[in-house]
Every structure is written in structure tokens, then in C-alpha cells.
């Protein structure tokens, strides 16, 4: 693809998995999940020409909450003491707001091989009112897990591209954060996942009408290994596809994007004994003292979203884009539900050594 075409066909798709949850103000933490908006930016997925560095600066805002009166069945996951406590509480409000600022650098080693480094900085705000304690807001911020991806362009033509990627998540994000009570916050509230992860992906794009309509699709899979606390985040599958449309031929600087994003997430699991919380007494009853690998109830989800957006070429200096992700179907298994999310970003291409 030419440099000029790169500006016109910046696809808006990204997989920013930022799993964050809420803090529990007493001696246990509820395992509530909140996920981030996932729109993919085509300039992240493509392989730049040799010597070109494509830089994306992205801001992502994703609110999540439980429907009114729900969320009381979310269990308490205490990974530090290897305890999983089932719950049945009266819940009036549980919410999380996740903000992620991402620096993504995509470099063309050759015209077919690329190297991508993704650095997320996350801020998590959360609060829960479960009717058994005074709600205490929780806030944390810092670096998330760094992702490094090697990519190969299987089909480099003027109108199409098929890119195979293999990414590795490095456990650079904080995983030992503690609440104001001194207790370690549960795994899903930490900024990082605490262990390495693998992320194979396949990206495809084709110009249906040159310089006017561009089709794109992406499939990716994430597997994170069990961390030292015995907690393992569930596998994740993402499927996305859509069109980039230039509505006016004389206005090549203005692009509309329309896409559908589907995500399936497996239940998390942890090494733990099993308890049942009794809200009448405020104590937990031991059900099974054996510490074994157990699925965490109410984790895992299925989600389908429609994501419209725009991209503007800023005087051939950079590209700016904005996307709104609107839920179409969601099954969050009794946990927090992702609401309308927003993504804003800018793309800039630099010529480094080795290019022509």
C-alpha cells in the first residue's frame, strides 16, 4: 500500500483488553468484571513499508455497571488467601469506569515483516454498594501489560492485505496493589494480569472500490497463563469486520467507518477453597476446604457491538479518529455490563533509517 493510501484507509479496530473491577471495603473483594471498548485501528494491524514507523496515540473510555438490583450474586475472590466465597446480597449499585491511554508503535522491518509494541496506561475507578458495608470508592492508575507483536504480510498487493500476527503480553502492569484496608485487591481489579499471555491474530483488508470503499476484518485470540496467585484470566476471542467509506470523492480527507465487533470471554478460574457468605451474620461458611482450580462464577461474557466513527486527514500531517461503540447484544453472566464506550486517537507516520 502507498503512503497516501495509508491515510485514506486507516481502519478503526483495536483489542484493548483492560480488565478492571471494583474494590470491596471489608475483608473480601467481589469478583466484578469490566472490559474495555475494543475497536481496532488498521494502522496498528497493517505492516508498514520498510523503514516507516506508525505511531498511534489512543484514549479509550469504557463505563460498566450492573442493572438496578443486580450484582448481588457476584462472588468474592481472595487470591492472596486462595478463597472463593459465593454470595447472595442485595445490590443497589456496582460500577467501574476504565480509562486507557495507549501508545502504539508499529515499525516496518521489511515490506512484509513488522514489529509492534503497545504500551497502555490505565486508570480504574470503581464503587460497589452491596448493602452490607459502607461503599468505599477505589481508584488506581499506572502502566498495564505491554504487548509485543511480530507480524507478517501474507498478501501484499495494491488493493489487499492479509497480515498474520503473533503477540506476547508481558506482565509489566501492577499486580500487587492493595486497598485502603491493606488487603490485596482481587485479580480482576489489578492493572496487569500477573503473567505472560499469547495473542495470535489474522487481519484482512480489501479495497472494493479504490479510494472510496475499503473492507476489513480481524480475528484474534488471547490466552493468559495462570499467575503466581493461582488466578487465570479466561481466554478471549474477538471477531470484527466492517467498511471504511469516503462519501465524497473530492474529500479524500474525510472517512466514515462502520463496523461490528464480537467478543467471547471464557470464565476466569483460580486455585481456592470454597465458602458461602451469609449476609445475616456477616460471616462465611466453609463448603469445601480443598484448594483446587475452580471456575469463578459470573466471569465470562458474550458481547456484540456496532461501532460507527470518523477519520480525518489533518493537512497530511497526521490522522485523527473518533469511534463510539454501542452495545447490540450482551450477556455478562450476572456481572457488570459494558455500556456505550468511546475511543479517540491520532496516527502519525515517521520515516526512519532503512526506508527509501
Label each residue range with its predicted role.
Residues 68-70, 74-83, 230-356:
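Outer membrane beta-barrel transmembrane domains
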Residues 51, 97-101, 140-146, 160, ...:
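Residues that define the transmembrane beta-barrel architecture of outer-membrane proteins
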Residues 86-149, 153:
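Long, hydrophobic/aromatic-enriched structural stretches that serve as scaffold segments
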Residues 42, 87-91, 132-138, 185-190, ...:
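Extracellular loop and loop/strand-boundary signature of outer-membrane beta-barrel proteins
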Residues 59-65, 119-125, 154, 168-174, ...:
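Transmembrane beta-strands of outer-membrane beta-barrel pores
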Residues 24-81, 174, 351-356:
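Outer-membrane beta-barrel biogenesis signature
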Residues 43, 57-59, 103-107, 117, ...:
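Residues on the lipid-exposed face of transmembrane beta-strands in outer-membrane beta-barrel proteins
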Residues 53, 113-115, 148, 157-162, ...:
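Repeated loop/turn-to-beta-strand initiation elements of outer-membrane beta-barrel proteins
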Amino acid at each position: 500500500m502507498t503512503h497516501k493510501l495509508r491515510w485514506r484507509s486507516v481502519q478503526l479496530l483495536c483489542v484493548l483488553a483492560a480488565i478492571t473491577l471494583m474494590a470491596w471495603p471489608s475483608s473480601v473483594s467481589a469478583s466484578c468484571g469490566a472490559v474495555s471498548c475494543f475497536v481496532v485501528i488498521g494502522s496498528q494491524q497493517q505492516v508498514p513499508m520498510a523503514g516507516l514507523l506508525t505511531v498511534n496515540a489512543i484514549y479509550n473510555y469504557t463505563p460498566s455497571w450492573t442493572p438496578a438490583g443486580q450484582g448481588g450474586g457476584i462472588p468474592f475472590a481472595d487470591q492472596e488467601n486462595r478463597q472463593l466465597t459465593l454470595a447472595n446480597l442485595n445490590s443497589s449499585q456496582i460500577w467501574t469506569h476504565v480509562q486507557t491511554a495507549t501508545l502504539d508503535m508499529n515499525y516496518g522491518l521489511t515490506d512484509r515483516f513488522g514489529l509492534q509494541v503497545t504500551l497502555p496506561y490505565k486508570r480504574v475507578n470503581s464503587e460497589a454498594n452491596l448493602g452490607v458495608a459502607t461503599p468505599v470508592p477505589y481508584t488506581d492508575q499506572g502502566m498495564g501489560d505491554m504487548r509485543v507483536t511480530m507480524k507478517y504480510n501474507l498478501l501484499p498487493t495494491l488493493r489487499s492485505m492479509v497480515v498474520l500476527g503473533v503477540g506476547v503480553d508481558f506482565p509489566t502492569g501492577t499486580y500487587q496493589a492493595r486497598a485502603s484496608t491493606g488487603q490485596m485487591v482481587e485479580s480482576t481489579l489489578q492493572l496487569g494480569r500477573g503473567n505472560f499471555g499469547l495473542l495470535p491474530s489474522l487481519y484482512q483488508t480489501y479495497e472494493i472500490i479504490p479510494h472510496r470503499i475499503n473492507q476489513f476484518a480481524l480475528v484474534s485470540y488471547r490466552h493468559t497463563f495462570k499467575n503466581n496467585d493461582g488466578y487465570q484470566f479466561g481466554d478471549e476471542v474477538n471477531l470484527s469486520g466492517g467498511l471504511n467509506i469516503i462519501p465524497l470523492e473530492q474529500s479524500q480527507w474525510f472517512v466514515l467507518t462502520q463496523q461490528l465487533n464480537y467478543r467471547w470471554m471464557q470464565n476466569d478460574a483460580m486455585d481456592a477453597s470454597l465458602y458461602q457468605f451469609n449476609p445475616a451474620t456477616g460471616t462465611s461458611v466453609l463448603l469445601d476446604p480443598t484448594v483446587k482450580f475452580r471456575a469463578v462464577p459470573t466471569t465470562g461474557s458474550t458481547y456484540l457491538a456496532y461501532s460507527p466513527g470518523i477519520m480525518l486527514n489533518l493537512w497530511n500531517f497526521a490522522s485523527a479518529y473518533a469511534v463510539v461503540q454501542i452495545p447490540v447484544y450482551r450477556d455478562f453472566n450476572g456481572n457488570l455490563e459494558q455500556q456505550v464506550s468511546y475511543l479517540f486517537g491520532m496516527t502519525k507516520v515517521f520515516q526512519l533509517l532503512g526506508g527509501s
